[in-house]
């Protein structure tokens, strides 16, 4: 009998284990090869359709549908290359001398270090072009490094004429920004900030012509510039992409945790819980509040039966009949609160899955978070001072205002019922006495530190409205 078992193991199970071990040992080579293939695919798109240059989404050679097709392929290949490079690094980190010896015994030959280095170098050369792709989704096309260098390198022969030209460049970019308010990568933000500082310094000085005439000249030059329309179109496309990415990410961070909670509760937590629970020894009430609610409901039911028995024209019920109805109601309440207790326990584990899904979504969506931040910056800073002050007052009054303790109390009691915990009044009152105060301090510090520097007029409007 043992010999038969050994023969079955050697004939069926051992080859499966050996092939799985070979697959594990080949993980570094396989990951690097897949990343290399993804880089080759990107390079092929560049060579065939962009003359060997970087894939430019603002190119006017192809239509929007074609560029969307290239963008989808590029995103997929970049994702594959980066994931496989990460897998390669981790598998190399776990690889040691014993694994290499086992690979040689299994007949596995790793590629030479020169081949590996050449592939890694090629992958880095291809991927490095798209490191700031997420910035470029929201980057304006109206400002380029060459324009900044040309503007800063020209000597100011005529102060007024120089002011007019610089004012024209700034107004051209500001016109597009006022229409679609695109954002910029850090390098362009720094360059444009330095350029605007120089322009403001020149504008503050007294020139031959008034500044209003210079701004009029700049506006006319913008209207007559043949590239102005293309700049507006490009910035509209970038703003549209930014809005789509931001709204999609907002929907994801709302829908994914809720969907994870419902699916994990129905498909994972409930079957496991129902398998291990014992209906005979299962606790009916998780806390004293549930018990008090059940007893109060049963007492009201008993009083209602007696009251209806006294005022009805039908023959009075006997004590046994009343006791039977009360017993049926008690069993109904026991089943109801047993289900509520089980549901509360399931909610705890389902919420853990939801939090895990939320954290995972944040970790894998860092580019989307950056785009979302830029989107909110443009929306908030595009509001008027009165609107900013109104929103600040609304949020502060809701969360830290005079009536906010009632809202916090409802939220905490709802969370307690959701998890089957008793509503601890001492903890609730302590939370209400401390957390809104901390939140109010953070609000005031943010207003004093950041908003006062970014928009002093909004702070002044906020103070006037608050008074």
UniProtKB/Swiss-Prot annotation:
Signal peptide (UniProt feature, chain positions): none
GO cellular component, one term: plasma membrane
Superkingdom of the source species: Bacteria
InterPro entries: CemA (IPR004282)
Segments of skewed composition (Polar residues): 146-161
Subcellular location: Cell inner membrane
GO MF terms, alphabetically ordered: proton transmembrane transporter activity
Region (Disordered): 146-167, 186-205
Family statement: Belongs to the CemA family.
PANTHER family in the cross-refs: CHLOROPLAST ENVELOPE MEMBRANE PROTEIN (PTHR33650:SF2), CHLOROPLAST ENVELOPE MEMBRANE PROTEIN-RELATED (PTHR33650)
The name this protein goes by in its record: Proton extrusion protein PxcA
Organism: Nostoc sp. (strain PCC 7120 / SAG 25.82 / UTEX 2576)
Source species taxonomy: Bacteria, Bacillati, Cyanobacteriota, Cyanophyceae, Nostocales
């Amino acid at each position: 009998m043992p010999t038969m078992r050994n023969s079955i193991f050697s004939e069926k199970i051992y080859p499966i284990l050996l092939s799985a071990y070979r697959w594990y040992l080949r993980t570094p080579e396989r990951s690097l090869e897949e990343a290399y293939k993804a880089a080759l695919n990107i390079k092929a798109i560049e060579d065939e359709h962009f003359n060997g240059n970087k894939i430019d989404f603002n190119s006017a050679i192809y239509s929007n549908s074609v560029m969307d097709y290239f963008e989808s392929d590029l995103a997929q290949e970049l994702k594959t290359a980066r994931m496989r490079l990460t897998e390669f690094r981790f598998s190399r980190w776990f690889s040691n001398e014993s694994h290499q010896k086992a690979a040689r015994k299994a007949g596995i030959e790793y590629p030479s270090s020169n081949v590996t280095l050449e592939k890694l170098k090629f992958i880095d050369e291809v991927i490095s072009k798209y490191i700031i792709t997420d910035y470029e989704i929201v980057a304006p096309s109206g400002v380029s490094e060459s324009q900044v260098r040309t503007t800063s390198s020209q000597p100011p022969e005529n102060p007024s004429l120089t002011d007019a030209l610089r004012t024209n460049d700034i107004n051209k970019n500001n016109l597009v920004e006022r229409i679609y308010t695109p954002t910029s990568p850090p390098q362009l933000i720094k360059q444009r900030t330095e350029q605007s500082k120089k322009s403001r310094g020149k504008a503050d000085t007294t020139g031959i012509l008034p500044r209003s005439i210079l701004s009029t000249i700049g506006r006319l030059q913008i209207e007559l510039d043949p590239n102005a329309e293309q700049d507006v179109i490009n910035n509209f496309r970038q703003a549209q992409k930014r809005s789509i990415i931001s709204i999609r990410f907002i929907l994801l961070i709302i829908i994914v945790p809720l969907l994870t909670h419902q699916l994990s509760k129905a498909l994972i937590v409930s079957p496991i819980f129902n398998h291990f629970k014992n209906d005979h020894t299962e606790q009916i009430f998780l806390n004293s509040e549930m018990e008090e609610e059940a007893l109060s409901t049963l007492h009201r039911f008993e009083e209602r039966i007696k009251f209806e028995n006294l005022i009805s024209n039908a023959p009075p019920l006997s004590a046994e009949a009343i006791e039977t109805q009360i017993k049926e109601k008690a069993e109904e309440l026991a089943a109801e609160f047993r289900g509520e207790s089980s549901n509360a326990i399931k909610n705890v584990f389902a919420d853990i899955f939801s939090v895990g899904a939320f954290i995972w979504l944040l970790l894998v969506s860092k580019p989307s978070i950056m785009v979302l931040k830029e989107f909110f910056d443009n929306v908030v800073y595009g509001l008027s001072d009165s609107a900013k002050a109104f929103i600040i007052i609304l949020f502060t009054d809701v969360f830290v205002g005079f009536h906010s303790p009632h809202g916090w109390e409802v939220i905490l009691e709802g969370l307690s019922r959701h998890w089957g915990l008793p509503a601890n009044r001492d903890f609730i009152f302590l939370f209400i006495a401390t957390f809104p105060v901390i939140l109010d301090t953070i609000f005031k510090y943010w207003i004093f530190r950041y908003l006062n520097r970014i928009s002093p007029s909004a702070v002044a409007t906020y103070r006037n409205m608050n008074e």
